[in-house]
Amino acid sequence: MKSNIVLLINPWIYDFAAYDFWIKPVGLLSIGYYLEKYGYQTYLIDCLDRFHPFNPVVKNKKYGTGKFIRTPVEKPEILKHVPRKYCRYGMPIESFLKALSQIPEPDVILVTSWMTYWYQGPQFAIKILKEKFPHLPIV
């Protein structure tokens, strides 16, 4: 039986640098608003939410900006020549998995992305989601 639960995911950023200048998934939040308006129950996991309760405490700059939590990762082949560290920015994987375990099983999962260049964030999130919910549609 369908429960009309939708999980919304704003995934990590993979890049050489990223900084939180009030980055919020406005498009995804708008979709969530309309889904709730029409009777769906929504849950949001924002991997870029520096203040998520499962994350380590982060320092805040003036006006709420600040550094994302970052985890060094291997560079894609095409970027190996760039002499800079390549990182996954956003919540630790353990925090993501804990957040997933705290919500009821959804009927569908929606994953967003800020730009094509950051494809690795959605790709990694979808990989984890397919392992946890192999039978669910992921859009």
Predicted regions, residues:
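A short, structured N-terminal alpha-helical element that caps or precedes a catalytic domain
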Residues: 1-139
